[in-house]
Amino acid sequence: MSEQDLPLPIGHFVTLDSGLRLHYLDEGSGPVVVWLHGSGPGASGYSNFKGNYPDFIAAGFRNLVIDLPGFGRSDKPDNINYDLDFFVSAVSGLLKALDVQRCTLLGNSLGGAIAIGLGLAEPQLIEKLILMAPGGVEERATYFAKIGIQRMVELFNAGPLDIDKMREIMSLQLFDASHLPDSLLAERVAVARHQPHCLFSTMMVPNMTERLEELRVPILGFWGTNDNFNPVGGVMKVLDNAPDARFIVLNRCGHWVQVEHRELFNRSCLEFLLQA
């Protein structure tokens, strides 16, 4: 299957000054919410958030659902380092190209780390942050000690992922694997076949805990106590260091709060966004 034929909606494309071409969905009108997905094989903005952003459209928000470089319909260069600075620069470039002056960043896992990184780099751009089990608050070795990360990297490096292998990876993301329809697995398998091997081997995200005090914007966070990818102890890293943060911690919940507790997630986010 060619990238043109991926089972994902086609939205808009922007080419950055670097030549990198990024894909994004632009849905709704109003204050801007930027959706930043995580780093799982085959991920895209749509596959991560298709159960969430429609409620934000209905509530009067403009939603920029981005495919990060290396994912979805965006470019997937095989000759670069997929480190945090690269991702932050790419998202910043896209927002500048779209003349976004102010926005809320909403990020899951790697996307949460990017949201923190961009919030530190360009604080004037950020109105609020919504973080779901964000990366960037532990050392790399801590994340790679988690069974979810270990198995994900092992299966990705072993060769092309099929539906069964993708189901194994994605089941580790959730407490209740019944939330995994075959259509979602098929979307991710199709994207994963185009992803370069350097994507995960060069993915370096620093521990930003000591800089969280610089984030002077309201933060709403979510974390599942059964997270197999990012340790739930990260909650206290954010609460102890960021000046204005609150978290919803859920038991019987894995790495994908927005999927396993969709209604609670959508409602809580919208209440947070609509607060003065």
Predicted segments with their positions:
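Flexible "cap/lid" loop of the alpha/beta hydrolase fold
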Residues: I116, L120, E127-P160
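Short beta-strand/loop motif that positions the catalytic acidic residue
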Residues: L215, G221-W223
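Catalytic active-site module of serine/aspartate enzymes centered on a nucleophile-bearing elbow/loop
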Residues: A245-A276
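Gly/Ala-rich beta-loop-alpha elbow adjacent to hydrolase catalytic centers
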Residues: G107, G111, A115
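Conserved HGGG/HGGXW glycine-rich cap/lid loop of the alpha/beta-hydrolase fold
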Residues: L16, L20-R73
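Acidic catalytic loop of the alpha/beta-hydrolase fold
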Residues: T225-N230
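Active-site loop/oxyanion-hole signature of alpha/beta-hydrolase fold enzymes
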Residues: L25, A58, V65-L106, R267-L270
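Conserved alpha/beta-hydrolase catalytic His-Asp/Glu region
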Residues: A145, G159-R216
